[in-house]
């Protein structure tokens, strides 16, 4: 690893919607530059997590350094910083964009611009990145590059006359992409003489070396053995190992302004090296940290409980370890009369929640019961105190509260024109407020709605996909809190309230949701030896009820003809036994019942 002049460094990332071929393109660039030998190559090289390969999405950020000899004969260093494309991980995208000077905008030549591409492009424009449009999958029969170029020009306002037509899968246009990175992406500014400032854009936990921090040097120089200080947390560490990612770790002695690398410094937890934090030297420290760091806040909460309560310590250890590599995950212990001991966890969104659950089950062999997700409500009490409530069972009673506010999001849906009616109908039933509708092209439309986050986190995404045969894509961003007519609905099974099934609903929809929920529970809870009443209640008022009939033995089977009083005696004896059993019996509630809230038909 020789010293490189700053003018020969290019830092870039790839922006794309899910499935537009970003990871495949990254693979081709690694191969073309000889960074990864053909025999070591596996698909989605930068997606290290097994789960990422399986779902075909990028979750954690990766980075790779490539040496490339351009056609002008000069040797360049290209740093690719891979970004996730999913809406939940937009905070990961924003910090990786901060580490770049340029971005490849990858758009599927048959699909066109999608919602998440747009959101990420706007982030890139905010960071003043040079954007190079690339039309991928050009060899597909449905590809229409001219239409997609027009779309990019109209929607984003980028000049597409020089857009590169490529196919990452068959390797078309890869050389052209590399050349345009060298010629169009500006080099980093040369600030080697300034005090050290480096931006952390990712970190992960290594069980042997502690936290490995991926960073980009913005100003100054960092050397192995330096004592560094993290400006947000104020903690100091000594660098044990310094290196670059090509894409495997290669140790170096020092890194200068503009370079991308990693540090191991015996850091105990990822929370100590927060992403977006600034690294500086302990002695000659910088006065100002780098701007734009925001701590990621969980938007969605749910309860996680082990099916076997003896494994509670294992779940705690697993969450601790996961939090080491996922700073956005929050958790705190929670107990529930129905489920025993568990944790209340906070996530960035639904996909993040699913991934954490799946990783807990897969990597730590845990069997989990999860409660339905809820969002954070703001409750103002009569004393004027503002409480943040992330668990419906913690909502103060009506006589103690002045108002409840819920988070609202701005939802942008890009859809083919013929599904607009179905989507407007869906948004209307989810308490959406229509804001705007724009035609991107003759066939594609953007719908903009404002709606409560609680309506989006349940199954809005699935409903949207099924109503548009999978063609629509969406993006949402938080716009603040608004007051609403919200009530807590409790579910009583056998006259006992079950905390994990409690939900906060809008008063107008309470009856429909309650009715649908008890009907769903009736299907899911198996019959017992005694009759089980199911009720949905707001306060002490029952708004919907169902009952699961008892399984009963035919006690009259032995009576042939004979006296009616004999039959009555046997039936009364059975009824007495059932009554006693009901008083002391417990109801087994299966896992599916707790997720029933998600799969309700909410269209009342």
UniProtKB/Swiss-Prot annotation:
Physiological role: Required for accurate and efficient protein synthesis under certain stress conditions. May act as a fidelity factor of the translation reaction, by catalyzing a one-codon backward translocation of tRNAs on improperly translocated ribosomes. Back-translocation proceeds from a post-translocation (POST) complex to a pre-translocation (PRE) complex, thus giving elongation factor G a second chance to translocate the tRNAs correctly. Binds to ribosomes in a GTP-dependent manner.
The protein's enzyme class: hydrolase
Family named by the database record: Belongs to the TRAFAC class translation factor GTPase superfamily. Classic translation factor GTPase family. LepA subfamily.
Any matching Pfam family: EFG_C
Domain tr-type G: 7-189
E.C. no: 3.6.5.n1
GO CC annotations, alphabetized: plasma membrane
Upper classification of the organism: Bacteria, Bacillati, Cyanobacteriota, Cyanophyceae, Synechococcales
Gene3D superfamilies reported in the protein's UniProt record: 3.30.70.240, Elongation factor 4, C-terminal domain, Elongation Factor G (Translational Gtpase), domain 3, P-loop containing nucleotide triphosphate hydrolases, Translation factors
Annotated source species: Synechococcus elongatus (strain ATCC 33912 / PCC 7942 / FACHB-805)
Membrane-protein topology: Peripheral membrane protein
GO MF terms, alphabetically ordered: GTP binding; GTPase activity; ribosome binding
Top-level lineage group: Bacteria
GO biological process, one term: positive regulation of translation
Record bears the keyword Transmembrane helix: no
Keywords attached to this entry: Cell inner membrane, Cell membrane, GTP-binding, Hydrolase, Membrane, Nucleotide-binding, Protein biosynthesis
Amino-acid positions noted as binding GTP in the UniProt annotation, renumbered to this chain: 19-24, 136-139
Name listed for the protein in its UniProt record: Elongation factor 4
Catalytic activity: GTP + H2O = GDP + phosphate + H(+)
